[in-house]
Regions:
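Helix-to-beta-strand junctions that scaffold the AdoMet/dcAdoMet cofactor pocket
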Residues: 123, 219-221
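Conserved AdoMet
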Residues: 34-90
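Class I S-adenosyl-L-methionine
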Residues: 171, 224-227, 232-355
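Conserved SAM-binding loop of SAM-dependent methyltransferases across substrates and taxa
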Residues: 111-124
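Polybasic, low-complexity RNA-engagement segments
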Residues: 1-13, 17-48, 291-294, 301-459
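S-adenosyl-L-methionine
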Residues: 131-169
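Mobile active-site "lid"/loop adjacent to the S-adenosyl-L-methionine
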Residues: 136, 172-213, 230-237, 260, ...
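Conserved class I S-adenosyl-L-methionine
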Residues: 101-110
Length: 459
């Protein structure tokens, strides 16, 4: 049941469009997935898949699928071949337009849809800091970054205020997918509907101002920031952006291409609208195939030199010294083929866990870090056991040994089953149709299952 006060406000906002908006709640909800370009070629996947896919206009790797496809129950999902994501939610990261080699912050990143989309655009180059303030959600974020094979991410569990105290004009781009009243998700999420109130809208709007102010201080001059919500409330959209611009005159709204069905922000819906508020973007379910969303693309005025680094209070993390790294490199070669020289210079020990640091990764002290780069393995006595994250980040060609499974065999592997195998003993990268899934270890004539017990499931 939609809240009556919400309906009354939407009727006032939409006027003659209101009946069409209301009818959209009776329509089937559109579902989509985003293909992971680090795992597969998009054209190849479309050609080979049995899924019924249609393109999402604003995201090159995004596709609507049909309910009977059930991509979440396919082993390809566990292999990180795609990420299931609400179609409208793909728009903000597309407009962020992150580039390889940049330093990018996703400030409110859980569960990870936008972060994994940003990571795909960065192609494993540069530094992505994906942050989430709530510990349980930060854990889910970290797991999703792992599943999608992201190599250059630092996952943190901090408040925006703590990060703002660490980083000054440091990031090239910042995504602020702000906590909101969730009105755009009422069709998808009954809990958001039950928790809604006009008072909560005001609370969210105030919190959004605080988050944006923190983000503003961390963005370098000339940098881009995208603000997004999944709500219709003007107080959290046009209102929040107008107030932010009034308090931060060094920012302006960037006019961007709007795709068919996207609407302009509306000045009349807020008391003191910014002059260019019409250049923000509204996504309504009665206009396009997706849920409710709002997007504002902002730019900070000024320019910086090519070698500009910004300020990080922690400084950069120091990698292992060459002599110390040498022993771990030997351990890695038990299950990896050739290790690039550049990677060999970025090894980092986090407790007993060996990681490959992203370029220019900030030092981890005074930060609650869940994932400082790509997890390579666990140090156990005098040996190195490969990490699940490593399996998901490499191709079969990069492993010393690999073992390919059919889809049905992969389902058994994901459930924790062992299987008979013959070959050279040792670690094997287990794949499904050539997509990496996890590790197995061949001993005797049995491939022991090393898929993490906490992730095992029946598909």
């Amino acid at each position: 049941m939609l809240p009556q006060l919400f309906l009354d406000r939407m009727k006032q906002m939409l006027e003659e469009e209101y009946p069409a908006f209301l009818n959209s709640y009776e329509d089937t909800r559109y579902q989509a997935l985003r293909i992971n370009p680090s795992k597969t070629d998009t054209d190849r996947f479309i050609e080979e898949t049995s899924f019924h896919l249609q393109p999402v206009p604003w995201e090159a790797n995004g596709f609507y699928y049909e309910k009977e496809d059930q991509p979440g129950k396919h082993p390809y999902h566990e292999a990180g071949v795609y990420y299931i994501q609400e179609p409208s939610a793909m728009a903000p990261a597309a407009y962020l337009d992150a580039q390889p080699g940049e330093k990018v912050l996703d400030l409110c990143a859980a569960p990870g849809g936008k972060s994994t989309q940003i990571a795909a655009a960065m192609q494993g180059k540069g530094l992505l800091v994906s942050n989430e303030i709530h510990p349980a959600r930060a854990k889910i974020l970290s797991e999703n970054m792992e599943r999608m094979g992201v190599k250059n991410v630092m996952v943190t569990n901090e408040s925006p205020q703590t990060l703002a105290g660490m980083f000054t004009e440091y990031f090239d781009r910042i995504m602020v997918d702000a906590p909101c009243s969730g009105e755009g998700m009422f069709r998808k999420n009954e809990q958001a509907c039950e928790e809604w109130s006009p008072e909560n809208v005001q609370v969210c709007a105030a919190r959004q101002q605080e988050i944006l102010a923190c983000a503003a201080s961390m963005l370098r001059p000339g940098g881009r920031m995208v603000y997004s919500t999944c709500t219709f409330a003007p107080e959290e959209n046009e209102g929040t952006i107008s107030r932010f611009l009034e308090q931060h005159p060094q920012f302006h709204i960037v006019p961007v291409k709007k795709y068919p069905g996207m609407a302009d922000g509306v000045a009349a819906w807020t008391k003191h609208p910014a002059a260019e508020i019409g250049d923000t973007i509204r996504l309504f379910p009665h206009h396009l195939h997706g849920e409710g969303h709002f997007v504002a693309v902002l730019e900070k005025e000024g320019t910086v030199s090519e070698n500009y680094r910004g300020y990080c209070a922690n400084g950069e993390e120091k990698p292992l010294a060459k002599g110390e790294a040498k022993a771990y490199l030997a351990g890695l070669q038990e299950f990896l083929g050739k290790i690039p020289a550049d990677d060999a210079g970025r090894l980092f020990l986090f407790g007993e866990q060996l990681y490959l640091m992203p370029e220019h990764m900030p030092a981890t002290r005074r930060l609650h870090v869940l994932r400082p780069g790509l997890h390579l393995g666990t140090v156990k006595k005098n040996r190195l056991e490969p990490a699940h994250a490593l399996a998901l980040a490499i191709s079969p060609q990069e492993a010393c040994h690999s073992w390919n499974l059919s889809v049905d065999e992969a389902r058994a592997y994901l459930a924790g089953q062992t299987f008979p195998a013959e070959g050279e003993k040792g670690w094997y990268l287990i794949t499904v149709d050539g997509y990496s899934l996890g590790w197995g270890k061949l001993a005797g004539s049995v491939m022991k299952n090393h898929y993490p017990k906490g992730l095992r499931k029946l598909l």
